[in-house]
């Protein structure tokens, strides 16, 4: 018989068990949610999600493949890398759609494809066509290593993305746990680094390694493409604030801005439903957030504070009806 592990410290805070019945916080919260959906948000029913202008590709084949013990690093984690980029989008106040690698990319101005270790030829061709057609693609370290049959791509890395990115990886230089590498733009990275040879004259080196055996070598690259698109490569796992700063530069190049006022970016997450257009605002912080001069009408989730402000509670969610945007704008 399995025994339960013994806790040596304070008991963790756990959700109320279902058997607690109607006299419990969870039950009351669920009842209140039902009331809000029925009374306050009935008009939202039937609306569709409005796609974002940026996409984040998450590949489950790569997720499982990098868990093997025969790779250069045991610290690789597709989920963590993707989550880091998702957080960067939240900090920038920009909506992003999380998609599988075979999803349609039409309508997306920027596509981030982190740690695509498994890169079938068909996926590589779609990514190349997307960037050459005017889209802005971001690839990261240890991508394009094997195909869908786990056969190594010959000719150098990152496999079929070499020509698009305008570079070749000479050597992998994984970092030990806790080890850091500095870049000459003031940023730093962990987990991984590459020795890169730039092969296309138009490929720009945005940052170089500032210390260690790779000092002076390219770390962040960006290749403008004739069709107006671009292909960027990130060869290390950037720290949070530095990843957010890089993403801001990439978003600006793709012509994508935030739909949130500047004071809400990083604090409030936005989701948008089409139709009359509804904005769902989720407070990511443990503090109340003031919503000043937002367009539209609040339907739920806020309290008034003065004539021109409403307050969104800590971890709270508010829904607003806003005028439909001009499709041409």
Language-model-detected regions and their locations in the chain:
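Carbohydrate-binding surfaces of carbohydrate-active enzymes
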Residues: 1-329
């Amino acid at each position: 018989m399995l025994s339960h592990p013994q806790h040596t410290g304070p008991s963790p805070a756990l959700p109320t068990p279902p058997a607690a019945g109607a006299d419990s916080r969870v039950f009351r919260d669920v009842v209140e949610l039902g009331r809000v959906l029925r009374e306050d948000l009935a008009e939202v029913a039937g609306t569709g999600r409005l796609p974002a202008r940026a996409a984040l590709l998450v590949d489950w084949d790569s997720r499982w493949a990098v868990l093997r013990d025969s790779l250069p690093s045991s610290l690789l984690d597709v989920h963590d890398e993707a989550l880091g980029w998702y957080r960067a989008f939240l900090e920038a106040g920009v909506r992003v759609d999380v998609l599988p690698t075979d999803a349609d990319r039409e309508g997306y101005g920027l596509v981030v494809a982190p740690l695509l270790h498994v890169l079938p030829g068909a996926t590589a061709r779609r990514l190349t066509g997307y960037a050459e057609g005017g889209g802005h693609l971001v690839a990261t370290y240890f991508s394009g290593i094997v195909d869908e049959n786990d056969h190594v791509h010959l000719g150098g890395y990152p496999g079929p993305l070499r020509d698009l990115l305008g570079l070749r990886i000479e050597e992998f230089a994984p970092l030990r746990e806790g080890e850091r590498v500095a870049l000459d733009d003031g940023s730093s990275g962990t987990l991984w680094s590459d020795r890169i040879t730039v092969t296309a004259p138009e490929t720009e080196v945005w940052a170089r390694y500032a210390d260690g055996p790779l000092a002076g070598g390219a770390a962040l690259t960006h290749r403008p493409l004739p069709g107006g698109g671009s292909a960027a490569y990130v060869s290390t796992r950037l720290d949070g604030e530095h990843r957010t700063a890089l993403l801001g530069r990439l978003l600006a190049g793709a012509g994508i801005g935030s739909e949130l006022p500047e004071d809400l970016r990083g604090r409030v997450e936005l989701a948008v439903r089409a139709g009359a257009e509804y904005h769902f605002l989720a407070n990511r912080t443990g503090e109340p957030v003031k919503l000043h001069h937002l367009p539209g009408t609040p339907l739920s989730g806020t309290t008034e504070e003065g004539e021109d402000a409403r307050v969104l509670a800590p971890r709270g969610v508010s829904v607003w009806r806003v005028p439909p945007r001009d499709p041409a704008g």
